[in-house]
Amino acid sequence: MLPVEHHVRIGQILIAENGEVLKTVLGSCVGIALVWRRQNKWALAHCLLPYPETFKEDKEARYVSQTIPRMLERMGATMADVSELEAIVAGGGRMMDGDKNYIKFVVGDENLKAAKAVLEKHRIRIVAFEPGGEQGTKMRIAGDGDYSIEKLPKTA
């Protein structure tokens, strides 16, 4: 029997167990996966922006800065459990063409920086970090920690 697959949408966090597969497609957004092998749980978030412009509580994954605490809470993990977690980060591509000299805020780059900073702050070990480059990324995670990160073909 094939595993049940769930697509994680922009600003969403999904938690899986029992062989389920989580997947998403990313551009400048960043995908953050947490794997908790001992509990046989894993989570995937599809984050749109690094930080809110003003303090705005978000219960999902719109902002990288607020996502990790939500994921831990939904997985049932506490700060005492973070040493058992593994993180996989992908996406954060530079999806806009143009003169890079005029782009002061490249959202994909900022999303990746924020993801790394927030995971380090929570002392969660990053086992894979795959920046998107200048193309989209497909990310897939299964419970045994098996994951795939695939670059999508560039379109003209």
From Swiss-Prot:
One Pfam family linked to the record: CheD
CDD domains, per database record: CheD
UniProt-listed Enzyme Commission number(s): 3.5.1.44
Keywords assigned by UniProt, alphabetized: Chemotaxis, Hydrolase
Disulfide bonds: none
Biological process according to GO: chemotaxis
Gene Ontology MF terms in the entry: protein-glutamine glutaminase activity
InterPro entries the UniProt entry points to: CheD-like_sf, Chemorcpt_Glu_NH3ase_CheD, Cytotoxic_necrot_fac-like_cat
Catalysed transformations (reactions): L-glutaminyl-[protein] + H2O = L-glutamyl-[protein] + NH4(+)
Described purpose of this protein according to its UniProt entry: Probably deamidates glutamine residues to glutamate on methyl-accepting chemotaxis receptors (MCPs), playing an important role in chemotaxis.
Family of the protein in this entry: Belongs to the CheD family.
Protein name according to UniProt: Probable chemoreceptor glutamine deamidase CheD
Species: Bdellovibrio bacteriovorus (strain ATCC 15356 / DSM 50701 / NCIMB 9529 / HD100)
Gene expressing this chain: cheD
